[in-house]
Amino acid sequence: MIVGVAYAKPTVQVWKHVDVPDTATARDAIEKSGLLDQFPEIDLSTQKIGIFGQICPLEKPLKEGDRVEIYRPIHPEAELLEKRS
């Protein structure tokens, strides 16, 4: 089945389509996408992930067409800058 894996930084957004087995989990799709190699700062032990904006565990089974999203942590400095604008 084909699913998407998305990751965004302030300067770049990546959305890859990957072909995974019908029994694949969100972790499987992320690993197969190559994003962990492309963006070594991704740490799945601390960063949250979701499917279509809904937080989920890495072991969540996927369905055809799902979009797995890797979320970046929000830093307090970013929140302060936003409030000052």
Swiss-Prot record:
Query: Which InterPro entries does the UniProt record give?
Result: Mopterin_synth/thiamin_S_b, RnfH, RnfH_sf
Q: Which domain of life is it from?
A: Bacteria
Q: Name one Pfam family in it.
A: Ub-RnfH
Q: Which residues form a coiled coil?
A: none
Q: Which family does it belong to?
A: Belongs to the UPF0125 (RnfH) family.
Q: Which HAMAP family match?
A: UPF0125_RnfH
Q: What is this protein called?
A: Protein RnfH
Q: Which organism is it from?
A: Rhodobacter capsulatus
Q: Which gene encodes it?
A: rnfH
